[in-house]
C-alpha cells in the first residue's frame, strides 16, 4: 500500500498508529535514502555477531522486516527479539513472521524500561531520534550494559550539521530526494510539521560521543547519505 498519510491536513503530532503502520514499509523505502543498502549492512554484521548463536534485539522493530531477513540468513539458531510500543506495527509484524515462518519473539514494550537479557547484538533503526534527549543517553547506557564484551550496537539515525548553511543544504538535498520518490511539496511540509519536537536528531559527532560516554569502546559511521547515517558501536 502506498504512503498517502500526509496528502491531507494533519492536526496531531506524528505517531506510529494504524494509519502509519499500514503504509510503513512503503514510507521507509521512499523516505529513507538507500534504506535497503543500510539494512544489508545490519544483516551482514548480525550474521557476524550471531555466528555461534546468541541473542539479538531490534529496538523499534516496526513490521519486523529486518529481523525476518536476518533470520533467513543465519547459519546457527539464535534468539531474535523485536520490541515496539506500537501494537499496530506488531500486528503486521506477527502476520509477516507467520507468512515467512520466521521464529522471532515480538513484544509490545517500552525500550526504556525493558529488562534485557545479556545479548550479542542490539539494532536500532531510526529509533533513538524519537527518544527525548534527556533520557536517550540512559537508554544507550542500558544497551551497553546488556551487551557481552565485543558485542555490537548498530543504529541508524537522521543527523544534523552544526554548520548552518550546510545543514540547510543537506535538508534541501533530502527534500529533492523525496520529490523524486513522488512526494509533493505539501506532503513534505506536512510531515516536517508533524515531526517537529517529536524527532530530535543529533550530529554525527554527538552520536559517536554519546556511544563512547555510555560504555562503548569504539563507534564510527559505516554508511552515510547526506543527513542519514548508520553507526556501529563496539562494547
Swiss-Prot record:
It comes from the Bacteria. GO terms for molecular function: carboxyl- or carbamoyltransferase activity; S-adenosyl-L-methionine binding. Its EC number is 2.1.3.-. Keywords: S-adenosyl-L-methionine, Transferase. GO terms for biological process: tRNA wobble uridine modification. The keyword Magnesium does not apply. CDD domains: AdoMet_MTases. S-adenosyl-L-methionine binds at residues 35, 60-62, 84-85, 110-111, 125, 192. Pfam families: Methyltransf_31 (PF13847). It catalyses: prephenate + S-adenosyl-L-methionine = carboxy-S-adenosyl-L-methionine + 3-phenylpyruvate + H2O. InterPro entries: CmoA (IPR005271), Methyltranfer_dom (IPR025714), SAM-dependent_MTases_sf (IPR029063). Belongs to the class I-like SAM-binding methyltransferase superfamily. Cx-SAM synthase family. Catalyzes the conversion of S-adenosyl-L-methionine (SAM) to carboxy-S-adenosyl-L-methionine (Cx-SAM). Homodimer. This is Carboxy-S-adenosyl-L-methionine synthase. It comes from Sulfurimonas denitrificans (strain ATCC 33889 / DSM 1251).
Amino acid at each position: 500500500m502506498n504512503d498517502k498519510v500526509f496528502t491531507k491536513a494533519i492536526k496531531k503530532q506524528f505517531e506510529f498508529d494504524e494509519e502509519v503502520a499500514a503504509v510503513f514499509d512503503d514510507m521507509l523505502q521512499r523516505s529513507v535514502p538507500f534504506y535497503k543498502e543500510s539494512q544489508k549492512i545490519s544483516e551482514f554484521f548480525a550474521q557476524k555477531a550471531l555466528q555461534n548463536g546468541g541473542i539479538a534485539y531490534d529496538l523499534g522493530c516496526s513490521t519486523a522486516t529486518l529481523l525476518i531477513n536476518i533470520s533467513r540468513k543465519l547459519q546457527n539458531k539464535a534468539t531474535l527479539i523485536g520490541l515496539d510500543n506500537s501494537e499496530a506495527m506488531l500486528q503486521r509484524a506477527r502476520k509477516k513472521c507467520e507468512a515467512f515462518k520466521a521464529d522471532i519473539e515480538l513484544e509490545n514494550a517500552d525500550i526504556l524500561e525493558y529488562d534485557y537479557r545479556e545479548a550479542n547484538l542490539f539494532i536500532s533503526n531510526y529509533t533513538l531520534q524519537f527518544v527525548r534527549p534527556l533520557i536517550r543517553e540512559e537508554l544507550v547506557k542500558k544497551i551497553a550494559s546488556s551487551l557481552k564484551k565485543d558485542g555490537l550496537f548498530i543504529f541508524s539515525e537522521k543527523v544534523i550539521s552544526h554548520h548552518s548553511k550546510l545543514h540547510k543544504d543537506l535538508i534541501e538535498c533530502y527534500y529533492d530526494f523525496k520529490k523524486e520518490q513522488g512526494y509533493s511539496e505539501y506532503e513534505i511540509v506536512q510531515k516536517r510539521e508533524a515531526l517537529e519536537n517529536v524527532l530530535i536528531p543529533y550530529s554525527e559527532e554527538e552520536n559517536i560521543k554519546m556511544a563512547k560516554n555510555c560504555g562503548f569502546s569504539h563507534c564510527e559511521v559505516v554508511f552515510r547519505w547526506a543527513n542519514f547515517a548508520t553507526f556501529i558501536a563496539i562494547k
